[in-house]
Regions:
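Short low-complexity, flexible loop/linker segments enriched in glycine and/or proline
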Residues: 26, 119-120
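Long, contiguous binding/interaction regions
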Residues: 2-18, 32-115, 121-178
């Protein structure tokens, strides 16, 4: 992939369950050539891919940053879960482009059995629109997807989500630690 086209960045690594993931960024033409080359080489071992020429910056931030529900606007929370990393990135991008929502987290594969999930927060109508767009994108690409909308997120749950999303990390800390 990197020999076929100049890329802005490339991240690779293994994730559960025994998959190898490649994430690339750069100008649209270069990424398209790299993705075509990579998918051609991968052949039938390729599990999934997504090519987003104009991925929303909130999706990128949600992938690379710690989750932060503490400052999210609105009372509603939407959760979209997919069976692949590519599908959740695609769903998150569709959702945030369709509605005025925050994207506090997009989590990929590790500790999730290879699945991914995205969180949308905001006013109920906006979260519903974001989740609907994410679900529609999944249906168009024949992606297995689950979703739920919590209309009024309780403050205790918001506080828990603002600290750490992985339960094993939360349980390993002593009471009173964030």
């Amino acid at each position: 992939m990197v020999k076929a086209s100049p890329l802005g960045s490339i991240y690779t690594g293994t994730v559960h369950p025994g998959r190898y993931v490649i994430v690339v960024s750069g100008d649209t033409a270069s990424v398209e050539v790299a993705v075509d080359t990579g998918s051609s080489v991968a052949g039938d071992t390729l599990v999934d891919l997504v090519f987003l020429p104009d991925v929303h910056p909130l999706v990128v931030d949600a992938i690379i940053s710690e989750a932060d529900l503490a400052d999210c606007r609105g009372d509603a929370l939407g959760v979209v879960e997919t069976v692949t990393i590519a599908a959740v990135i695609d769903a998150a991008d569709a959702g945030v482009k369709a509605a005025a929502v925050d994207v506090p987290a997009v989590r990929l594969a590790d500790g999730l059995g290879g699945k991914g999930y995205a969180l949308f927060s905001g006013d109920l109508a906006e979260v519903e629109a974001a989740v609907d767009a994410a679900v529609s994108r999944g249906e168009r690409t024949d992606t297995e997807l689950r979703h739920v909308i919590i209309a009024q997120l309780h403050d205790e749950i918001r506080d828990n989500l603002a600290r750490e999303l992985r339960l094993n990390y939360r349980l390993a800390r002593r009471p009173g630690e964030r």
